[in-house]
Each structure stands twice: as C-alpha cells, then as structure tokens.
C-alpha cells in the first residue's frame, strides 16, 4: 500500500511539472503517463487533450516543433507516441497497449548524414546537452499523422509517418501501417492491408 501511495504521489508531482506544456479539459492522466521533451520550449503547449479522455501512454517530443492533439472520450493505453511534426487523434478512439506512432524517419536515408548524426549526438552528449540538441532535422523526412474518430488500434501496432487512419477503421494487432486506412474498414498485416469492409450496420450514421 505504501509503495503504491508513493508511486501515485510521485506521478502527481511529475504531472504537475508537465502541466505547463499541456492544455486539457477534464481528462485523466494515469500515473504511468509521461512526456519526454528532448528540447523543451518553456512557453509552448505541446499536448492538447479534450474532455473525458484517458492517457496511459508515453509521448516523446523530438524537437520544439512537435504537437500532439487528442480529442474527446478517447483512450490511449501503454503506447508510445514519438512526435517531431504533428499527431492528431480525434474523438472516441481506442489505442491499445504496446503500439508506436511515429511521425518521422528519425534519420536520413543517406549514410553520410547518419554518420554525422552519430558524431553530433556524441558531441552534444559530452557537453551535457540533450543528445539531439543540434540534430539536423532538415535531412529527416517527417509527415503528420491523423487518426480519425471512432478508430481502434490493436495491440503492438506501428503507425508510420504521413498515415491517416480513417473514421471507424480498425487496425489489427501487430500491424505495421505504412499507408492510409480507409474509413470503416479493417486492416492488418505487415504492411497493413484492408482485409474487410465493415457493414453499414456497424458504421456511425
């Protein structure tokens, strides 16, 4: 009991520190929820959350430009959002545990850029800075992600940059989503493909 109480108090203190970066209604942040700001900007709102939403996830903002928006009455389980650009999750969305939503490539396709990336990380780290404090993002492809209302993302999925998950769409567990998923369909696999179209009686009117 005492250990659980300690964990709860520590989480509350962490959430209070992070509150300057968050705009939210009456939504709830579970004790395991966390935000990692690799290059924090003190006067910026990084995360906007609507009402009646539950967040039990980890969000990493790779740069000052990142922004995550979550709508009303959504649930994000123990998943990881990695944002440099923009990730939008609309209303009534379920995201299960173990999924990763990633709006950029992290590194260039050119090996020479990656070599310089490693050297710059070492320089920054040895100076006591964030290891990506001076990362060259200009050579890294990044595109926003949109997950529309009433979608459901199963466990252990990977959603990559530039993807739109359509309204009411379902992504099966363990899928790797590299392309858009149409409204009211079920997609699965690696890479994810549409495997079923939901009937009219399962669609929102």
PLM regions and their residue ranges:
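Extracellular carbohydrate recognition
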Residues: 163
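A generic "structured core" feature
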Residues: 166, 170, 175-176
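Domain-scale signature associated with acetyltransferase and cell-envelope carbohydrate enzymes
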Residues: 1-150, 156-159, 167, 183, ...
């Amino acid at each position: 009991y005492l250990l659980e109480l300690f964990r709860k108090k520590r989480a509350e203190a962490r959430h209070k520190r992070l509150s300057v970066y968050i705009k939210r209604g009456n939504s709830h942040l579970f004790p395991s929820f966390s935000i990692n700001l690799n290059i924090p900007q003190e006067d910026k709102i990084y995360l906007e959350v609507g009402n009646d939403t539950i967040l039990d996830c980890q969000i990493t903002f790779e740069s000052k430009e990142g922004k995550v928006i979550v709508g009303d009455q959504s649930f994000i389980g123990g998943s990881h959002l990695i944002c440099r650009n923009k990730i939008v999750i609309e209303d009534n969305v379920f995201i299960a545990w173990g999924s990763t939503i990633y709006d950029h490539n992290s590194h260039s396709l050119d090996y020479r850029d990656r070599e310089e990336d490693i050297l710059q990380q070492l320089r920054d780290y040895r100076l006591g800075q964030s290891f990506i404090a001076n990362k060259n993002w200009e050579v890294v492809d990044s595109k926003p992600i949109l997950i529309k209302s009433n979608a459901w993302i199963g466990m252990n999925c990977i959603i990559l940059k530039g993807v739109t998950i359509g309204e009411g769409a379902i992504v099966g567990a363990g899928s790797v989503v590299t392309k858009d998923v149409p409204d009211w369909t079920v997609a699965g696999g690696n890479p994810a493909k549409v495997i079923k179209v939901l009937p009219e009686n399962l669609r929102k009117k």
